[in-house]
A protein has these predicted regions:
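Key DNA-contact positions within bacterial/archaeal DNA-binding proteins
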Residues: 2, 118, 130
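Structural detector for helix-capping/boundary residues
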Residues: 2, 7-10, 83, 105, ...
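Generic alpha-helical secondary structure signal
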Residues: 16, 20, 51, 79-87, ...
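Catalytic-site neighborhood detector that most strongly recognizes the C-terminal catalytic loop/helix
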Residues: 25, 124-150
Length: 165
């Protein structure tokens, strides 16, 4: 949440479709990221790109911060949670959860859809895939085969391919 709170337009590269994570905002104070591994470039999906274009049209000339109030001051995630997030969850009849948990949802959905685990780890600011598999893989049923059949199919396919050359 501190990365979102501290996101500034100078760190949004529309041309390369990247969000550069360089600073965080904690209690209205800009700070460097928690760890050197947290400094990263996040790839913008088409939906994120489109949403940020719309946000830029709405607030780009108003503030250096991507997410700001009418005065141009950065939004505080606590205020957004209280005024928007939790009421929206109640309205939709969903179980209450912290906005930060959307991070877990994203990781789980990326894994379930077959995205490259190294790419996911980089997007999330992990320096290795270890944390990714430790925390998130348990939420994805049948993420990996446990009987060796995938390797066997690969070998059979490879050997059959060699016969035809």
């Amino acid at each position: 949440t501190a990365e979102v709170d501290g996101l500034q337009w100078k760190y949004v590269d529309f041309e390369r479709r990247q969000i550069l994570i360089r600073e965080t905002l904690v209690d209205y104070v800009l700070e460097t990221t928690k760890t050197p591994g947290s400094v990263r470039e996040i790839h913008m999906s088409q939906m994120v790109y489109d949403a940020l274009i719309n946000q830029f049209e709405a607030t780009g000339s108003q503030s250096e911060f991507v997410f700001c109030n009418k005065k141009g001051n950065p939004l505080r995630h606590r205020d957004v949670s209280k005024r928007i997030w939790y009421p929206a969850l109640r309205y939709m009849g969903l179980k209450s959860r912290k906005p930060y948990q959307t991070r877990h949802t994203a990781a789980t959905l990326w894994l379930a859809s077959g995205e490259n685990p190294e790419w996911i780890a980089r997007q999330m600011g992990h320096t290795t895939t270890r944390m990714l598999f430790t925390v998130y893989s348990r939420f994805v049923p049948n993420l990996t085969r446990k009987d060796g059949s995938a390797f066997e199919r690969l070998m059979i396919t490879t050997m059959k391919g060699d016969d035809h050359e």
